[in-house]
A protein has these predicted regions:
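Polyampholytic low-complexity alpha-helical segments
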Residues: 3-329
Length: 329
């Protein structure tokens, strides 16, 4: 049986070993363990952990650290097992602190820092996988690290702008944290600029507007306000506009069909909103209704294009005429 290789002090001293250099801890692993010592030692001094528990904790972390460094492209499983270890430590320490009434701010900060560092290493290693970013977001959300969560979502979207689930997560996070529909709306607008016909993002944006309309309706009707602009919003006008623009970006009727099931489902959640009622009332004629809306939007876009081209031609003609007059002078 091997002797404990680490004494709870501010200095890490590796045990004697007959292993060659490739089997010993890397300098990075050793440094990380040294950085964790103050955290674990503070819990021991506060009598939240016993000496034996603290030593076992360090031994476990050494094993987990070495395994990550020894593996070329360590599998995700190794990172998740390390994260589970930190989670178990956190639960144990919180339970002991509640039981004893003891506080240990230094240890808490150290444990949180070590956990965040591990997650940062994880998303660096698996940055090409959107699922890895979602797992990190789940962790940050569970710890109420709101600012860090927003920063992480921004980084994830910069790497994976085509992943619709990340846009949905970012929009729901903004709405939950700020309580402002405009913030979530801005996220969806950014997502649709990059993915103009993505059905998941489009349905998320429509659902946001229907929810907004449904929330405003009781207040508006209760106050008896007769404002055409507000009435348009309450009737689902913004949701109608989002749908129209999304349909205009779709390449063909196949994409329109792919939207139908989700649209009916979303409309069913807000059946009191007039626009949702219109969607639901289409029945088997929904596809034809959507195709007609798409054609109308395409006609609007063509009219806008022609108008812009005409204005540009007039500007060029005016500029050319001005140049000729200057030359004559």
């Amino acid at each position: 049986q091997s002797t404990p290789y680490l004494v709870l002090s501010t200095v890490y001293t590796p045990p004697p070993s007959s292993c060659d250099d490739t089997q010993q801890m890397t300098e990075r692993s050793r440094l990380r363990l040294e950085q964790m010592l103050p955290e674990i030692d503070s819990f021991r001094q506060a009598k939240i952990l016993t000496q034996e528990e603290a030593t076992q904790m360090i031994e476990r972390r050494r094993f987990l650290e070495e395994r990550l460094d020894d593996s070329e492209g360590a599998p995700e499983k190794y990172y998740m097992e390390y994260a589970d270890h930190f989670s178990a430590c956190n639960k144990l320490i919180r339970k002991r602190k509640r039981k004893t009434g003891t506080k240990c701010q230094k240890g808490d900060i150290g444990l949180r820092s070590a956990t965040l560092h591990l997650w940062a290493r994880y998303v660096r290693a698996f940055r090409h996988r959107p699922e890895a970013w979602m797992k990190y977001c789940d962790y940050l959300s569970s710890r109420n690290m709101h600012h860090k969560l927003q920063q992480t979502l921004a980084k994830a979207l910069a790497l994976h702008p085509r992943v619709s689930t990340l846009w949905l997560r970012a929009a729901s996070t903004e709405l939950r944290l700020s309580g402002e529909v405009s913030r979530a709306r801005g996220v969806f607008q950014s997502g649709l600029r990059v993915n103009p016909s993505d059905p998941t993002i489009l349905l998320g944006a429509i659902k946001l507007e229907l929810d907004f309309a449904d929330g405003m309706r009781p207040s508006l009707e209760g106050q008896g306000v007769d404002n055409p602009s507000l009435r348009l919003i309450v009737d689902g006008g913004l949701a109608h506009m989002v749908l129209s623009h999304g349909l205009g970006a779709m390449r063909d009727q196949t994409e329109v069909r792919g939207l139908m099931g989700g649209l009916v489902s979303v409309a069913g959640e807000f059946s009191e909103v007039p626009f949702a009622q219109t969607v639901l009332s289409q029945g088997e004629g929904l596809e034809a209704w959507l195709v007609g809306m798409r054609q109308g939007r395409l006609a609007e876009l063509e009219a806008e294009r022609q108008r812009a081209a005409k204005e540009k031609a007039e500007e060029n003609e005016e500029a050319s005429s001005t140049e000729e007059e200057e030359e004559e002078e």
